[in-house]
From Swiss-Prot:
This is Putative uncharacterized protein DDB_G0277445. Keywords: Glycoprotein, Secreted, Signal. Residues 22-59 have a biased composition (Low complexity). One of its GO terms (cellular component) is extracellular region. Residues 1-15 form the signal peptide.
Length: 68
């Protein structure tokens, strides 16, 4: 009876350990995905800002024409 109990206890412990590992892996994956999304958003924002700055620079150019 003791052997059966220990086997069941070991299986239960292993299952709990596996669940904990899976949860940690899922959390890590979620964190990585969030970081990737944040990086992508930051890159997009930077690109948009650069485009806006370029547009503003192009629009603000002054051309001097000397007429003789």
């Amino acid at each position: 009876m003791t052997i059966i109990f220990l086997i069941c206890l070991d299986a239960s412990t292993q299952s709990t350990t596996n669940n904990s590992i899976n949860n940690n892996n899922n959390n890590n994956n979620n964190n990585n995905n969030n970081n990737n999304n944040n990086n992508n958003n930051n890159n997009n924002n930077n690109n948009n800002n650069n485009n806006n700055n370029n547009n503003n620079n192009n629009n603000s150019k002054v051309f001097d024409f000397n007429i003789f």
